Amino acid sequence: MAVSVQDLLDKIHFHVIYSTETALQKEITTSEIMRPGLEMAGYFDYFTPERIQLFGMKEWSYMMTVVGDNRYDLLKKVMAKETPVVIVARNLEIPSEMVAAAKKADIVLLQSREATSRLNSVLTSFLDERLAERTTVHGVLMDIFGVGVLIQGASGIGKSETGLELVKRGHRLVADDRVDVFQRDAFTLSGEPAEILRNMIEIRGVGIIDVMSLFGAGAVKDSTDIDMVIYLEYYDKEKAFDRLGNAPTIVEFSDVEVPQTRIPVKTGRNVSVIVEAAVMNFRAKQMGFDATKTFEDRLTDLISHNKESQ
């Protein structure tokens, strides 16, 4: 996967010093950012020109000590044709030699008012997300009480209907049917809709519903982290379901483990309310309140008390 320089400009604010149509279409293929400190001193053994070249105060200060043609010759090496974009942070002055080198190599030259470390972090985060490998899973992705919930289950079990009911109850839809899942960092999984299905829910017997048109902009969300999975399955009295909540299961997507809650579905059960309760219970556990442990402690105390009474 790749991100064009134009995509970068569309998402992050910069002051454009130099660009051309062809330069804006250059592709960024890595989220690693290059700060050419040693290169400005003439050491190019491990130079990686295909990365974004970011000039901070240190690189800029050294560059300004080099004068005349030497500065231009040095910048020509740093600003190679393979380089997608060069960015100068902290609104530092851009010398004419840098503009000339950008024109010669047809590289977009940008200026940012952000501090270098902050800009580095913003760029890396954006590129990590955009360049991450996508996996498609079947389900409904919702933001419920601020928790990213992926609702899965057999076809026809009522995932979309549950999602619609949750939207009516004030929660936000991210994706229905097809969810594009990607690993945002080593421990975080995120999901987003396919562009053609954005803001849409399919309800059997009704058809395609545009959630944003019917319920407003507050009922949809572009993407969310996936904090938990709720799996809907048909009720089977022969099957043992977790009744205490002390036997959580884990599912794995793209090497990231996500806790899963399995909910049996049968006539008369209000699935959307049960999903809300499961999410609130999940949040409570994250905050250190575990109803299962409280119950077990009470049961242990009761057993101990009964033994002492005998």
UniProtKB/Swiss-Prot annotation:
GO molecular function, a single term: protein serine/threonine/tyrosine kinase activity
UniProt binding sites for ATP: G153, A154, S155, G156, I157, G158, K159, S160
Keyword tags: ATP-binding, Carbohydrate metabolism, Kinase, Magnesium, Metal-binding, Multifunctional enzyme, Nucleotide-binding, Serine/threonine-protein kinase, Transferase
Annotated positions binding Mg(2+): S160, E202
InterPro entries: HPr(Ser)_kin/Pase, Hpr_kin/Pase_C, Hpr_kin/Pase_Hpr_N, P-loop_NTPase, Ser_kin/Pase_Hpr-like_N_sf
Active site, UniProt feature: H138, K159, D177, R243
Cofactor: Mg(2+)
Superkingdom of the organism of origin: Bacteria
Pfam families: Hpr_kinase_C, Hpr_kinase_N
Region listing for Important for the catalytic mechanism of both phosphorylation and dephosphorylation, in residue ranges: 201-210
EC number(s) stated in the UniProt entry for this protein: 2.7.11.-, 2.7.4.-
Record GO biological process: regulation of carbohydrate metabolic process
Reaction catalysis annotation: [HPr protein]-L-serine + ATP = [HPr protein]-O-phospho-L-serine + ADP + H(+); [HPr protein]-O-phospho-L-serine + phosphate + H(+) = [HPr protein]-L-serine + diphosphate
Residues in the signal sequence: none
Region (Important for the catalytic mechanism of dephosphorylation), start-end ranges: 264-269
Principal EC category: transferase
Role noted for this protein: Catalyzes the ATP- as well as the pyrophosphate-dependent phosphorylation of a specific serine residue in HPr, a phosphocarrier protein of the phosphoenolpyruvate-dependent sugar phosphotransferase system (PTS). HprK/P also catalyzes the pyrophosphate-producing, inorganic phosphate-dependent dephosphorylation (phosphorolysis) of seryl-phosphorylated HPr (P-Ser-HPr).
Assembly description: Homohexamer.
Family: Belongs to the HPrK/P family.
Misc. comment: Both phosphorylation and phosphorolysis are carried out by the same active site and suggest a common mechanism for both reactions.
Domain notes from UniProt: The Walker A ATP-binding motif also binds Pi and PPi.
Protein name: HPr kinase/phosphorylase
Species: Lactococcus lactis subsp. cremoris (strain SK11)
